[in-house]
């Protein structure tokens, strides 16, 4: 029997956890890979470990990539740089970590190659996002082609959240029966506070705004999700 395998790039945050629960519904064997790059919100690594165990996935690999910290100066890799909602002179937020998704997706692909997975799943998004260039659809598709050529194997990059806004991402978690798990147990906050977070950093504001919109109009947001994704309709309370 052909076993369908996937590798999820997993931070323990809202987006990657939503991708994980979706992957568990569609693949026979799900692996997760988490990266320790010296991030200031290091609690996310332990959050990822706990959730991986809770969901009973096939394997969870935590990789030390702190070398990225030496090269990528960002508010997420330097405690002395305060997180700011303002854009820098280059038009990017100071939470952008140069090369992060290039490295993560490349290493996840190597891991997928080793375990025989057909897909690498990442929660990047171009709809409600922080302006990071390595979250764009164009980038993901380009790197996917390069990686497949370099490995001489077709490993498919899946981006299930790419065209969903944050409200629709909450709807997707709800569709798979894990709205409260994602809300209460994931860590998205740049200040390392799980659940609803600090409420003031850019990540928390984006997450909270999406949740409020979803809770105010579940039926309407879910209808949009069905239209965008082609998921079969089912009752969501």
Curated annotation (Swiss-Prot):
Keywords assigned: ATP-binding, Ligase, Metal-binding, Nucleotide-binding, Queuosine biosynthesis, Zinc
Known cofactor(s): Zn(2+)
Protein name: 7-cyano-7-deazaguanine synthase
Keyword Metal-binding attributed: yes
GO MF: ATP binding; ligase activity, forming carbon-nitrogen bonds; zinc ion binding
Enzyme class per UniProt: ligase
Family, as annotated: Belongs to the QueC family.
Binding locations of ATP: 10-20
Keyword Glycosyltransferase: no
Gene3D superfamilies, per database record: HUPs (3.40.50.620)
EC number from the UniProt entry: 6.3.4.20
Binding positions (Zn(2+)): 189, 198, 201, 204
């Amino acid at each position: 029997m052909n076993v369908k395998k996937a590798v999820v790039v997993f931070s323990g945050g809202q987006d990657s956890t939503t991708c994980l629960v979706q992957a568990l519904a569609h693949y026979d064997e799900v692996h997760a890979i988490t990266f320790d790059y010296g991030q200031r919100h290091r609690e996310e690594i332990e959050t990822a470990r706990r959730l991986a165990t809770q969901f009973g996935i096939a394997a969870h690999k935590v990789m030390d990539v702190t070398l990225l910290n030496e090269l990528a100066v960002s508010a997420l890799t330097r405690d002395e740089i305060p997180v700011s909602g303002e854009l820098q002179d280059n038009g990017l937020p100071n939470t952008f970590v140069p090369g992060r998704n290039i490295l993560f997706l490349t290493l996840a692909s190597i891991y997928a190659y080793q375990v025989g997975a057909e897909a690498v799943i990442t929660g990047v998004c171009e709809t409600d996002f922080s302006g990071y260039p390595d979250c764009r659809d164009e980038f993901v598709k380009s790197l996917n082609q390069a990686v497949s050529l370099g490995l001489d194997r077709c490993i498919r990059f899946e981006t299930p959240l790419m065209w969903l806004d944050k409200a629709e991402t909450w709807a997707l978690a709800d569709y798979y029966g894990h709205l409260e798990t994602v809300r209460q147990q994931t860590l998205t906050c740049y200040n390392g506070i799980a659940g609803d977070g600090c409420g003031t950093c850019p990540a928390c504001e984006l997450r909270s705004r999406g949740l409020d919109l979803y809770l105010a109009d579940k039926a309407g947001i879910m209808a949009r999700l069905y239209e965008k994704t082609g998921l079969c309709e089912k009752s969501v309370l």
